[in-house]
């Protein structure tokens, strides 16, 4: 599951009102993320929206022809909104000069008449996200829905009278509201008697909401929800998760993606016709949008053997084509699809993708790569920021990429098992995967490493503190080290979620201390590389500082690099190249030799 799309409804893609032009967020120009436009059938991209010293994160296109973009500075995730008409320059739309306000721009934020854009803002209170409306012509902004909650825009009804809004309570619990766009009635659409996920995907022409939900099921399914009565009609309830969905602005078409053991399958309907589908040939759908009239879809396709690509799909004919592609540093013929392995473990078999170097002779070194989140999923593909992993395989290093408990894509129970159990069920899974790696004759047990970022950094620190003799080296990228200080130092907009995800500072303090890797940091034996963004709003820099200070005090070998203009990830290409280059060189040096 893709967190930014699922819980913020954001997209790095947009289609113009006539479906002829595609907007894409890319760092292809000056080395930072900007909005580019190109013909939907493919062609030369042109810069559309770029903001000095800012990185564009998401876009949407209004019926008036204006392209709206959200951009932040220095990785702070405090997005400002900008707009550009095709005949003019980009201009500020909703901007806080002090840069203290966070905004979320959904892919379907523009009203059907092209006059208004709805977005989330914490201008009133740093802990909450209210729904605001801004007039594209005048720039006039006003709040539409306020309250002590995190609200995310989920789309306008085709007649422009109502807004669908998601109220995020936890990663596995969301409610839906239907708002009168003029500022009147607020209807509670989902009457939550128990924890249920409800992720909006827009409106249908008959006035029902298109929703991804796990109501009554273990896996996420796609349904049509009557907002007045709460009655459901199932559209697609496969034995796998529905991961992404989008309805056209006119409600006459919709498209969705099903996650089948990590691989994606697209399905769509137009004007009540039969469902059509398209497999992505070993690929993964990372982003998905639909034009206002439903005639064309755009999606990002990822693969383990091909570079990042943007595709467009004609929903009438089913014809799909590549509109934009990037490149791999590793030659195409040297890339290979991973094998899906299920590793036995006490709490259930762990799905794991294993990448093996081509033409390997003898036992090879291997890297364990736990993903971030933890409520996310490693897919059988290399995204834009994971191509360096392909470089490791190219250099003769195997990759073992597990989806341990807490991962999405395998049902609600698997995902929610991590709640308030960081350092518990996940550590048991990591032990099982590590032991499996040590038993494989194809891997050199004396040359194993662990590398992860964000929650994956926490998992890395668990591994090196609880299984210190297993690792030749380790890489921690903005990982959580101390569960207590993580909760104490969290930004206000994250605090309401962290107590449900990690634990309560007062009630669970003893367990949090015991489960924190920093408590056992003296157990670390292997050399480490640690990378951190100075402005990280999710995992504060203090987390990495603690680890580095303690390791250096113990005389351990540790390399530490802080990027002053980055946050939770890398939005500047020069920084990304430096960081991923350091990771590849460090792991190659320690596992293979110079």
Regions picked out by a protein language model, each given a short descriptive name:
Residues 289-296, 300-594:
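Serine-hydrolase catalytic core recognition
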Residues 1-364, 374-395, 422, 436-439:
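Peripheral, non-catalytic segments that deliver or gate enzyme domains
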